[in-house]
Amino acid sequence: MRIILFGAAGNVGSRIANEALSRGHTVTAVVRKTDQLATLSEGVLGQLGDAGDSALVAKLSEGQDLIISAIRPSEGSEHLLPLLTKSLLAGAAQANKRLLIVGGAASLEIPGEKGQTVLTAPGFLPPSVLDIARACAEQHNICRENTETNWTYISPPPMLTPGIRTGQYRLGSDQLVVDENGQSAISMEDFAVALIDEAEQPKHHQTRFTAAY
């Protein structure tokens, strides 16, 4: 499979690239800055571009089988996430390509909390991450309202950290997947496994799923 990946220089994006490469897929990473090309994993094809340009997204996606977005704006630029998402959705629709979006946990419901989400539950999130959480919730709403693009939104659990690849995970839809201790977590490596599994064997179309241990 030929995959074009936006956000490949990030923590999650780099692991998605590595997982895809390990399975024999071809990965083209789109980055905004020349110096980011040197940070890409060996075997990843580098391409300069901007996810905010929907026409360019469509053009770069020509000859590709799948678009993946793992974009996460830096602190202070969280407001860009919804705008970039709209551009990616438009570009994917124009190119007639499937789009997998790494989103956030903000809109996931907390089991037993009467519909409260990670974002709305009082005190669940520290103030330092509220801006990106709000942006991710808006991002999810933008996807839900889109009927023109073959999109899939993948929400990580609240605890998404570097770790090891076990190949194990459990899937959910709109609620947090929690373990016997009430924790919802997964390593970035296994989150990448879940995403590439979905890329290879599509089961979610114009909907969201989540993966955790």
PLM features: what roles do these ranges have?
Residues 3-23:
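N-terminal Rossmann NAD(P)H-binding glycine-rich loop of SDR-like oxidoreductase domains
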Residues 4, 34-95:
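NAD(P)H-binding glycine-rich loop region in Rossmannoid oxidoreductase-like domains
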Residues 26-32:
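Conserved glycine-rich Rossmann-like NAD(P)H-binding loop of the short-chain dehydrogenase/reductase
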Residues 2-9, 97-99, 174-213:
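Mid/C-terminal beta-alpha module of Rossmann-like enzyme folds, strongest
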Residues 34, 86-131, 136, 141, ...:
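Conserved Rossmann-fold NAD(P)-dependent oxidoreductase catalytic core, especially the SDR/UDP-sugar
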Residues 146-147, 161-168, 198-207:
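Glycine/proline-rich active-site loop of Rossmann-fold NAD(P)-dependent oxidoreductases
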Residues 141-162:
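Conserved beta-loop-beta element that borders a ligand/cofactor-binding pocket
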